[in-house]
């Protein structure tokens, strides 16, 4: 399958170098086309700028109608779209089907969030009324990730379009097909020319996009990239930044030793789902330094060894697929080999499968200092501590603050954990990856910039306008103090 750019309502070939994506399970080609040059990107932004006034002025009900048609198209095309996402990312079909369902569900959630958080409110005043309205920013640049190449950019694009913004979307260079399919669906839904534009490419294309006259950058990706964007836009305070970055997420288990298998299931789902390629995956497991902690580790190892690893279309449905590429797997193994500690499960390759496949890894780092970095791979560090206070301190010993979890049967410990932990998503007896479109999703510190996405995406897609209004000119001369006679 091949594709290109979508600019001002037309598909066209890029003028840059070639770009291709491959199935990480097999290495087979999935998509190929030419990338966007800076001139192509400038055309896309100009088209979005030209389309903005009419789109923002369009009645809200008409924008909603287009987005609901988009939702219907996603539902109609769910089966082939899910297969395409699986081919490009390597994720199991059960996971990409869930991703498509989340994309479709985002439309109605965004409408509800828009009304609740950025709608119109009115209060009577002695002179008339005070009205709070919200206005679209303008042209939003959306940079998408590879791990959820549909769901995560969709979570920016849908609320932006609903608010009246126009969009220039650059998918990850690893997953260009996913971005193309999303834009094809929006085109089929009737999005007017210039309202949604697609440019393909890598870092150079992204750099060309942020250098343009944009009004906002909506980004999901690494903390390093987020730091770069903060610095880049330091002299452009007019550009709104919504940054959803990574995490070095802790999962604490305390006083839950009566059900080690159930605990292990939560740990495995936290650490190894999506082959560890979720920003909310647990990277650090903190347990008591006693027999109960040992039992939890033993049960987790036993369950991890039972996980089915395979291609997305394997007859025996896998829990874990490959990483996004062989390069990513090689880099992860290098980091794992440099991590201090005692290896419990090695982050090894999988016999009979390609070089992008890895087994889940577990390493005991008790008493050791480890780099405070996010490793986007199925590697879990275990730390044993002697008290719950020490567990809390270890959990908070990170510059990140995306997700955290407590597994415990004691509500008193949960109350303490909830009040002390520093993260934007804090779960109790649920995986750290547990999230919902009806709730905000975002983090603190190196994990974001206090503009959570999901239900709160409405907040950064429109700005508030406070108006004090009288329907006719009223004599306020008497209100002026200190007038000369």
Swiss-Prot record:
Is Phosphoprotein among this UniProt entry's keywords?
Answer: no
Q: Which family does it belong to?
A: Belongs to the aldehyde dehydrogenase family. AstD subfamily.
Which domain of life does the UniProt lineage start with?
A: Bacteria
Pfam families referenced in this protein's UniProt entry, alphabetically? Aldedh
What is the designated name of this protein? N-succinylglutamate 5-semialdehyde dehydrogenase 2
Per the UniProt entry, the Enzyme Commission number(s) are 1.2.1.71
Catalytic reaction annotation: N-succinyl-L-glutamate 5-semialdehyde + NAD(+) + H2O = N-succinyl-L-glutamate + NADH + 2 H(+)
Q: Which UniProt keywords apply?
A: Arginine metabolism, NAD, Oxidoreductase
Its biological purpose is as follows:
Catalyzes the NAD-dependent reduction of succinylglutamate semialdehyde into succinylglutamate.
Q: Which PANTHER family match?
A: ALDEHYDE DEHYDROGENASE-RELATED
Native organism is Caulobacter vibrioides (strain ATCC 19089 / CIP 103742 / CB 15) (Caulobacter crescentus)
Tell me which CDD domains the record gives: ALDH_SGSD_AstD
Locate the active site.
244, 279
Whichever gene encodes this chain, its name is astD2
Q: Where does NAD(+) bind?
A: 221-226
Tell me which Gene Ontology terms the entry assigns under biological process: arginine catabolic process to glutamate; arginine catabolic process to succinate
